[in-house]
Amino acid sequence: MYSLVTTSIIQGIKSIPVYVEADVSDGMPLFEMVGSLSPEVKESKERVRTALKNTGYILPPKRITINFIPANIRKTGSGFDLPVVAAVLCAIGIVPEEALKNTMVVGEISLSGDVKPVNGILPMVAEVKERGVTRCIVPAENQTEAQLVKEIEIFAVQSIAEMIHILNGGTYIEKEIGKAVEKTIRLLDFSDIQGQHFVKRACEVAVSGMHNLLMIGPPGAGKTMTAMRIPTILPPLDEKEQMELSKIYSVSGQFQLREQLMEERPFRCPHHTITMQGLVGGGLIPKPGEISLAHKGVLFLDELPEFKQNTIEILRQPMEEKEVRLVRVNGTYEYPADFILVAAMNPCKCGYYPDMQKCRCTAASIERYINRISQPLLDRIDICVETPQIKFEELNGTKKEECSDTIRARVIEVHAIQKKRYQKEDFQFNSQIPAARIAEYCALSKDQEKYMKKIYKQLNLTARSYHKILKVARTLADMDGTENILDAHLNEAVCYRNIDKRFWRDSL
């Protein structure tokens, strides 16, 4: 007898439909699985055989053939266990064929017959709904995640026996599984930071145009404290962004027990010992890395020169393309990576250069330390700002600082200006303006062109860093509500670029 079961596999954050065929026929007793399978999928036949036995069902002494369609896609992971069980049970007549129509089945099984959770349930359920599937059988621990997709019936099962009961028309009782993750209460605020007004201004500019930011300064100046508060001035995620971000966390296995889509923008702060694989993603079964987990949020790299050079250099392409593309023998995995890079570093090993009274480093050691950050990576950072040691009067002052909500309101207005301007384009923010459109959206007067020509030569700018200055100036103009870029906007944008040139030039 023949049966067909619908399931899915994750590739990147996309779900690809897979169909599990089962055929039970007379012949030499054999359990065979074909269809471009990884070792863990091939091993599932032993789990299936034993789990069914421990559930009370002995497979007949017949030839059982399982085929996975399409054959050109490598099948990986343990989520195929439950669909194989369903296909076999249907083929031997334990469950009716009609019960599996328009139904997706996914889940791992233990030898006892219990159903275990799998990663990527959210994109799987969302994708099969678009294909007309009306119900899904998923592991009980994935219930809350699956139910985030509306207008599709979800059956969360804890065992093979429960799945058989449901497929044979039995009553389904919804479960209360664990405790849902509570919404995070925001405790950080820009009003916590005393002084550092130039730094806070740079943060607002960076967020307003979605520009990358580098803070350079001595230890204890507030670089990390400032970076941690940047997500509090970012606008809320829209519904599409919430779903996309939630899919990334679902695939990475960090989304279970949530009762709603992710609403807060992520803030990821990997340690400087992180590997390339941990940063950009990968692995035997590829998973998103830190740059994808920071999608639509902030990726904070503290002590930037302490990262391995080949690790941070790998950021260059994702920073431009806003996605990560991992090419493997069994396919290409694409993960979104549209983040704001916020980096912090000391200007030397001891941290106090150019204060020669405190700095203990030699000229050679300063040069070695500062040059761990390559020029191509610096060119991709729009704003560089010096974070000086805060004065005692500012630290101990009673002046009330501006709160995050006030700054965020201004940022939302600037974002609205950009989205309206670029509504017919395939980009939304000033930082994303392609080189071919710079002249159109960042137009300068004749005098401004002469000024920028002088700056271009003085600072020895590259074409990319020159364009970064113009994009930041465009953001400053939007913040002031002016249609044209003014001289003051260009001057401020040049200041943000001049700081990195000063540190790197002085180290030579």
Walk through the language-model features, giving the residues of each.
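P-loop NTPase nucleotide-binding/switch module
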Residues: G169-V205, G209, P236-I291
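Peripheral, non-AAA+ core regions of ATP-driven protein-machinery
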Residues: M1-L214, P218-A221, M262, S465-Y466, ...
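Walker B catalytic acidic pair
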Residues: K296, D302-E303, I314
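Catalytic P-loop NTPase motifs of RecA-like helicase/translocase cores
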Residues: S112, L301-K308, G351
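Basic, amphipathic alpha-helical bundle interface domains used for macromolecular binding and assembly
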Residues: V34-K45, P60, N67-G77, I285-P286, ...
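Short beta-strand elements
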Residues: V18-V24, L279, D382-E386
